[in-house]
From Swiss-Prot:
Residues 231-251 have a biased composition (Low complexity). Residues 230-251 are annotated as: Disordered. It comes from Acanthamoeba polyphaga mimivirus. This is Uncharacterized protein L698.
């Protein structure tokens, strides 16, 4: 990127507020109002940089009145430049001064300066504008006009960046780094598309109406028990089978039931035999009971 001369730190230092220089004018005449200008700088200069010259009224602003006296033909152009610089520092009408926000990390963009660099350039532009306002008495009209030409190039460059990209505060906790004058929750930034990769999920081709297969019939408990090769059952066994049948028909489960096959009959044989003795069922035969258990299907 070709950086214009307006970015040069040496130039900013040459017209710094602390030392009023006769910048690019070759004017070595001592201005009798130099002390007056310095006093104005001490009282309002830093405040203007901090607030971004948000209020600029030529009729009531004493500094602009001095500029109008010295360089009347450039006053309208000065006001236009200052308003443009303020617009560069406004995002969605919420943030008035971009200098009041400090970012944890800069958000890099393709073929674009980082947001941190954008912030630094805006601040230098503010300093230059304030210096022009306070040091115009020791500058020639031609020198200020040349400076305005460079500032116009800078403003156009920054405007293109602002219009082309949107910036987002990093994901870490930035609340402590935000100026107390600003409401962080109101600031809405959008991550540029060149920073975050987009994952596009292709939806499957679904034709409506969707044909849902019919539900398969469940295995009945009564059928399972009747298929077991049991000997002739007693009256108590028939009673227990009827009770199981009533339970299976009255129970209407909405969720599909999962069938588990008993793999190891020895693991439940003890409880099976104990229940037979406890409820007075037929005398148990370990070999026969083992054959029965190996064929049982437990339905959950």
């Amino acid at each position: 990127m070709n950086i214009p001369s307006i970015y040069d730190d040496l130039m900013c230092q040459a017209i710094s507020i602390e030392r009023i220089k006769y910048w690019s004018t070759r004017d070595v005449v001592e201005n009798p109002r130099k002390d007056e200008i310095r006093s104005q700088i001490n009282t309002t200069g830093n405040e203007w940089i901090q607030n971004g010259i948000n209020i600029l009224d030529p009729l009531y602003n004493s500094v602009v009145k001095i500029f109008r006296k010295n360089h009347g033909s450039l006053t309208d152009r000065l006001i236009s430049i200052v308003k443009s610089s303020v617009q560069l520092c406004k995002f969605r009408g919420v943030v008035d001064s971009i200098d009041s926000i400090e970012f944890c990390e800069s958000v890099e963009s393709i073929n674009c300066i980082s947001f941190q660099k954008y912030l630094e350039i805006n601040k230098k532009l503010r300093i230059i504008l304030v210096d022009i306002l306070f040091s115009n008495a020791v500058m020639t009209t031609e020198g200020i006009e040349n400076l305005f030409n460079e500032i116009d190039k800078l403003i156009k460059h920054l405007s293109d960046i602002k219009n082309r990209y949107k910036f987002q505060i990093c994901g870490c906790d930035c609340d402590q780094q935000i100026s107390k004058k600003r409401n962080f929750s109101e600031i809405n930034y959008i991550t540029p598309s060149c920073v975050e990769p987009k994952i596009i999920v292709q939806p499957p081709n679904i034709e409506f109406p969707i044909n849902i297969p019919a539900k398969k019939p469940r295995l009945s408990q009564v059928q399972t028990i009747e298929q077991l090769p049991l000997r002739q059952s007693t009256s108590r066994q028939s009673i227990s089978r009827q009770s199981i049948s009533r339970q299976s028909t009255s129970r209407q489960s909405t969720a599909p039931e999962i069938i588990y096959v008993v793999r190891e009959p020895d693991s439940i044989y003890t409880d099976f035999a104990y229940n037979k003795r406890q409820f007075g069922l037929r005398s148990y035969n370990p070999q026969e009971d083992s054959q029965i258990l190996s064929q049982m299907v437990v339905i959950r």
